[in-house]
Amino acid sequence: MNHDKSPIILIGFMGTGKSTIGKYVADEQNLSFIDIDSYIEEKYKLTIPEIFSKHGEQYFRNLEFTCLQECINTADIIATGGGIIESEEVFNFLKNQKNIIWLDCNIDIIYSRINDDPHRPNANNKTIKQLNDLYCSRILRYNEIAFKKFDSHLLSISEIYYELLNLIKASDQY
């Protein structure tokens, strides 16, 4: 990646396809890709649920921001965790980034994808109403910083890929 260029940063609620789409686009275009959650797990040798359990959510959010800052100048595409916008400091940092792409999805589909997933501490053992409340609490923040929004339940991976490819070409960065 040319370090004068801004990465594509995928934001959105858990289960909307950020990691899947980010990896797909990176593979198709021979770009570098980092999934922040995977990066954290590799770097700290703990799973996300273990970090939540041992240290709490705020500690995890601090790690998330540290890792985002480490990756911002080295990755072409970054998939963030769904709650990355919870911290005011991270939110303000992201507001200053150029290529923020919001992947959104219908809450019923999200619920079917992540219900009782032990790797998602903010989703495990939650009712659809509890998950929807969390989702609704984040929508305005996603919307405020997103350059572009894609509804991943209405578009296929390849359709989102071609839309992102058009954005990449239009920005003439890669």
Swiss-Prot record:
Q: In which pathway does it act?
A: Metabolic intermediate biosynthesis; chorismate biosynthesis; chorismate from D-erythrose 4-phosphate and phosphoenolpyruvate: step 5/7
Lineage of the native species?
Bacteria, Bacillati, Bacillota, Bacilli, Bacillales
Q: Which cofactor does it need?
A: Mg(2+)
Cofactor note (record): Binds 1 Mg(2+) ion per subunit.
Q: Which residues bind Mg(2+)?
A: 19
Q: Does the keyword Phosphoprotein apply?
A: no
Q: What is its main location?
A: cytoplasm
The UniProt similarity line reads: Belongs to the shikimate kinase family.
Name the positions where substrate binds: 37, 61, 82, 138
What's a Pfam family this protein contains?
SKI
EC number(s) on file: 2.7.1.71
| Reactions listed under catalytic activity | shikimate + ATP = 3-phosphoshikimate + ADP + H(+)
The UniProt entry, under HAMAP family, shows: Shikimate_kinase
Q: What is this protein called?
A: Shikimate kinase
Task: Give the keywords, sorted.
Answer: Amino-acid biosynthesis, Aromatic amino acid biosynthesis, ATP-binding, Cytoplasm, Kinase, Magnesium, Metal-binding, Nucleotide-binding, Transferase
How is this protein annotated for GO cellular component?
cytosol
GO BP terms in the entry:
amino acid biosynthetic process; aromatic amino acid family biosynthetic process; chorismate biosynthetic process
The job of this chain, per UniProt, is described as:
Catalyzes the specific phosphorylation of the 3-hydroxyl group of shikimic acid using ATP as a cosubstrate.
Record-linked PROSITE patterns: SHIKIMATE_KINASE
Q: How does it assemble?
A: Monomer.
**Which GO terms label this protein's molecular function in UniProt?**
ATP binding; magnesium ion binding; shikimate kinase activity
Q: Which residues bind ATP?
A: 15-20, 120
Cellular compartments annotated: Cytoplasm
What is the primary gene name for this protein?
aroK
- Name the species this protein comes from: Staphylococcus aureus (strain MRSA252)
